[in-house]
Amino acid sequence: MYKRQGNGSTNAITLDGDENMQPDWVWVKDRGRAGYNHNSYDSVRGATKLIWQNLTNAENTYADSLTSFNSDGFTLGADSSNGEVNVNTQSYVAWNWKESATAGFDIVTFTGSGGTQNISHSLSAKPEWIITKSRSASGAWYTYHGANTAAPETDFLKLNDTDATADNATVWNDTAPTTSVFTVGSAFDNTTTYI
């Protein structure tokens, strides 16, 4: 986790200590102003590609938001178009993750089929937490957690919602993840791209 103040211009954020790394997922949140979004960037989709974690909106491109992933952190632009990650004098927090099978974290993309699909991952272990989001269309943040219920593959949560756990076979196809794949069902629309 990194806490900092925005400066409204190009701002290279250097991670140090336990976080001395190139992050592959950066989650930025304004700490001081109410009503601002959770901003999510990752190295698989590429810098400037933003998805708001608390909303169902499709992916957006903001050329002056998070502009690069660096070997020791990331760079933010002036943020004039989004206004949620680097406004001058505003206080922010950024959570950072490194994609690594050893660390138990993987980022994958896939295109939905509207039916049952096995999605490959590179963890070599059964995922305990899966978060999915459509990139090319609006849609829910379907979330799986291995400790959610006695049969978590039958249930889901939504990251963008405060609803309780729901039971619906169209999300995970009532199929537990394995050491090489997780399964999605018809809730993942045909030709829609997902992360």
Task: Identify the function of each model-found stretch.
Residues 3-195:
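Surface-exposed molecular-recognition determinants
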